[in-house]
Amino acid sequence: MQFRGNVMQENQNQAAEAVENEMTETASAAHTELEQTPEQRIAGLEAEIAELNDTLLRARAELENQRRRAQDEVAAAHKYAIGKFAAELVTVKDYLEMALLDQSGQIDALKMGVDMTLKQLVSAFDKAQIKDIAPKLGDKLDPHQHQAMSAEESDAEPNTVVRVMQKGYLLADRVLRPAMVVVAKAKA
């Protein structure tokens, strides 16, 4: 018990000394401020204001630089976003130009070249997540993916596809071009 009491007494003494030291430092700082003339006090505060203004200006400049860099990165991303797709299309264009330059007159070779070109284009579309919208005959008209170009009397159920005039395309899940279709209407 005696030992515990000594430790507690020592801790209390240390705490009291810490409080006393803090009070002395505070009083000393206050005393120093009191010893300053108003002009010195104003000059000190003006220097502090100038330092804070400088810090603020630097922070604003850094923020503006970050904003500008972010805008530049977004602009570059927009500008070069289709780079891979464009590279794929260049190959397709090369194949088409070679087919046009071919003067051999061999229809089978031309057909094979066009088939290879189509495969290259389909591969480019797959890589770019471009998919066909190719409704089948009898499919219900989907106004999100189909555009009814006309309606014709048919034995088919009304508002179903009876003919596809042109395929549509999706980019991922967004419609690039709706499929152009003719839909059935009830016979009069």
UniProtKB/Swiss-Prot annotation:
GO terms for cellular component: cytosol. The keyword Metal-binding does not apply. Homodimer. The gene is grpE. It comes from Chromobacterium violaceum (strain ATCC 12472 / DSM 30191 / JCM 1249 / CCUG 213 / NBRC 12614 / NCIMB 9131 / NCTC 9757 / MK). This is Protein GrpE. GO terms for molecular function: adenyl-nucleotide exchange factor activity; protein homodimerization activity; protein-folding chaperone binding; unfolded protein binding. One of its GO terms (biological process) is protein folding. It is found in: Cytoplasm.
